[in-house]
A protein has these predicted regions:
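Hydrophobic helix-coil surface modules that form long, contiguous segments used
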Residues: 180-188, 194-337, 366-369, 378, ...
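Ligand-binding face of N-terminal immunoglobulin V-set domains in extracellular IgSF glycoproteins
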Residues: 32-60, 65, 80, 88-92, ...
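N-terminal, polar/Ser/Thr-rich
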Residues: 7-34, 63, 499-500, 504
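Zinc-dependent metallopeptidase catalytic helix centered on the HExxH motif
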Residues: 326-406, 469
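Beta-strand-rich binding/interaction modules
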Residues: 218-219, 512, 519-581, 593-603
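Amphipathic alpha-helical substructures
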Residues: 433, 439-528
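Extended, low-hydrophobicity, Ser/Thr/Pro/Gly-biased non-transmembrane segments
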Residues: 78, 82-117, 122-127, 149-251, ...
């Protein structure tokens, strides 16, 4: 007996390592922070580093910053909504708010000194990037200790981070410390902050926070001192530790509630939210209840969650993922699932979001739809925390979605198809900061990125696609994968050549459009001609349904694949010779005559995102 075993070698690309030991004090009267960082930085590269860089994100929250000007410029572009309203192309949370901040509302981050071996280093500020000119270079394979003294003013909540948000949360503390810029095989990733994406160095965090003793604190990492002692100034001292992460977030508020539960061995889920009333209590209790229910499914589909805890925290301005935690404006489960899934596709895999936003947001959007559908279909109506009216709405939603194609992923496909027809589409490979419009960026990263996973299910088969996502996670967790890395795992999983698919889908805006071209009598069969109208070649499935109630699926693999997929469903699959990608038409023969045919349809599953389906189906009258 021969056993076929598919092995995935672990990649050996070098990456940097960092350990942070941060001690910071928050003055809740002045909204200021003073702190120190002790950093151990390991240069695992083959390069000698003569400079290093730090992110100073909060400096974006000042009038005429890059973020401010960029937002106001985007607001000059307008779109017409589905309701016919004129909509500005800026992020509605940012708009022109930064321009109108008062000095006491600014975000300010300042590094006073950085010393290495007792020697002060030269500091050059570039708004949200701090350049550090080293007195001695950091040699390959060496470790250096840096001591950083910093101070900051917490901005009023505008985007992601800040104080006193719309829901009344006192402090949502993300991007709050001088964070070292990632250096990788492409060099330093010194992207000025304009409210888009993040990328960080894998490391270990030991964070001590000091503040007013009336405040509750939670966030990334595991609390080391649950009793939180007082320091000499009467402030509570909180100490958190987290390992193999690339960011650290926390909240502080003096009117929060805290729920927690060990949902499986080695994993405790936490929920922190603003105290208000019994209705709010039920809504946040439902978050914990639902999270426990979907966790086994998430780990089955995406891989094991490796950290000892995860926290759902009310804060911020919508939903934003961080290491071992998320900030959420409210308890809506769609956002809850989305941000939690980011733990896999961003905080465990750690792709460069600026270059590959679709590998984060797109894969997460796909996962959100999958997990939400699973939850609503299997558990939602069992929740003790939602009303009977809400349960009826969920049942109606599940029934409505059952008639939408492609199944489960209808929203992503719809968003992508609207983008493809809008005239504003740019390639997914565009740097996240440099899309011409927010509309193009968001639909490329979220909708087109999510559609890509659905499309892979069409090309390689859904069982292979599901295996791909697990193989990708297990091969590349904690290793900063890029687009080529993902496609190589897809090729190894499927046995197909898929570089062509990546080039067309990621690096171009070419669209898929196929149509039924001609039908002719051919003795006891029919000759059906299919035409490729768009510039994007694909393998094609055509289902022929006969008047006797039988059906057959005619499958034409694309020559670029150098292979094909196995039969997926119950319909008999007839495999035809490969379709040469440059040929605009393809003709195949049915097994029954033309007068026996009831209908012919290209891709009835609608997993192939065809921009014009009006020519994909024909009903033949009696």
């Amino acid at each position: 007996m021969l056993l076929s075993v598919q092995l995935f070698a672990q990649p050996e690309r070098w990456q940097q390592q960092i350990n942070y030991k941060i001690d910071a004090s928050l003055d809740v009267q002045k909204n200021t922070i003073k702190g120190t960082e002790e950093i151990l930085y390991t240069n695992n590269s083959t390069d000698t580093l003569r400079k290093v860089y730090f992110h100073m994100y909060w400096n974006a929250f000042q009038p005429n910053s890059n973020m401010d000007v960029r937002s106001r410029e985007l607001g000059k572009t307008t779109f017409t909504s589905r309701r016919g309203d004129e909509v500005k192309d800026w992020d509605m949370r940012v708009r022109d708010r930064i321009q109108n901040l008062k000095p006491e509302e600014y975000g300010i981050q300042k590094v006073n000194t950085i010393t290495i071996n007792g020697k002060a280093q030269q500091l050059i500020e570039h708004e949200t990037i701090l350049e550090v000119v080293l007195t001695q270079p950091i040699l390959p394979k060496s470790v250096v200790k840096m001591n950083v003294q910093f101070e900051a003013q917490v901005p009023v909540q505008v985007r992601r981070s800040g104080r006193d948000n719309k829901e009344g949360v006192r402090y949502s503390m993300s991007q709050w410390y001088p964070k070292m810029v990632e250096y990788d095989y492409q060099g330093w990733n010194t992207n000025p902050y304009i409210a888009r994406e993040f990328y960080g160095v894998w490391g270990n965090y030991d964070v001590t926070l000091r503040m007013d003793k009336t405040y509750m604190v939670g966030g990334t990492g595991v609390l080391q001192n649950p009793t939180a002692p007082l320091d000499k100034d009467g402030n509570k001292v909180w100490n958190f530790k987290g390992n193999t992460i690339h960011d650290f977030v926390w909240f502080a508020d003096n009117n929060f509630k805290h729920l927690f539960k060990e949902v499986r061995k080695g994993l405790t889920l936490h929920v922190y939210y603003k105290a208000k009333d019994a209705k709010v209590d039920s809504a946040w209790a439902n978050v914990l209840w639902a999270a426990e229910k979907v966790l086994p499914y998430m780990e089955k589909k995406m891989g094991a969650y490796p950290y000892p805890q995860y926290s759902f925290i009310q804060g911020g301005d919508g939903g934003m993922e961080y290491a071992m935690a998320t900030l959420l404006a409210g308890p809506g489960l769609g956002t809850v699932f989305h941000e939690w899934i980011h733990s896999w596709y961003q905080h465990i895999l750690g792709s460069n979001e600026s270059l590959f936003a679709w590998m984060d947001e797109g894969f997460t959007s796909y996962g959100e739809d999958d997990v939400t559908h699973f939850y609503e279909k299997n558990f939602a109506t069992q929740s003790p925390y939602i009303s009977e009216v809400a349960k009826k709405q969920i049942v109606a939603n599940v029934e409505r979605q059952a008639n939408m194609l492609p199944a489960v992923q209808y929203g992503n496909y719809n968003g992508y198809l609207a983008l493809a027809k809008s005239g504003f589409e740019e390639p997914m490979s565009t740097h996240a900061d440099h899309f011409n419009t927010n509309y193009a960026y968001s639909n490329a990263a979220y909708s087109k990125g999510g559609t890509f996973i659905g499309l892979l299910g069409y090309v390689m088969g859904e069982a292979k696609r599901d295996q791909l996502m697990l193989n990708y996670y297990n091969t590349w967790k904690f290793k900063h994968p890029n687009a080529n890395d993902f496609i190589r795992v897809a090729e190894k999983t499927s046995g197909l050549q898929l570089q062509w698919l990546k080039e067309y889908w990621v690096n171009s805006t070419k669209t898929i459009d196929y149509g039924l071209n001609d039908i002719q009598v051919s003795g006891n069969a029919a000759l059906i001609s299919i035409q490729r109208i768009g510039k994007f070649p694909m393998p094609v499935e055509v289902v022929v349904t006969y008047k006797d109630g039988t059906s057959e699926l005619h499958y034409m693999p694309l020559d670029l694949m150098l292979g094909g997929k196995q039969q997926e469903g119950a319909i008999k699959q007839i495999n035809h010779p490969e379709w040469k990608w440059a040929q605009p038409t393809y003709t195949f023969e049915t097994t029954q005559p033309l007068n026996a045919i009831k209908s012919i349809e290209i891709d009835p599953s609608q997993r192939m995102p065809d921009i014009n389906r009006s020519n994909n189906k024909i009903e033949i009258p009696n």
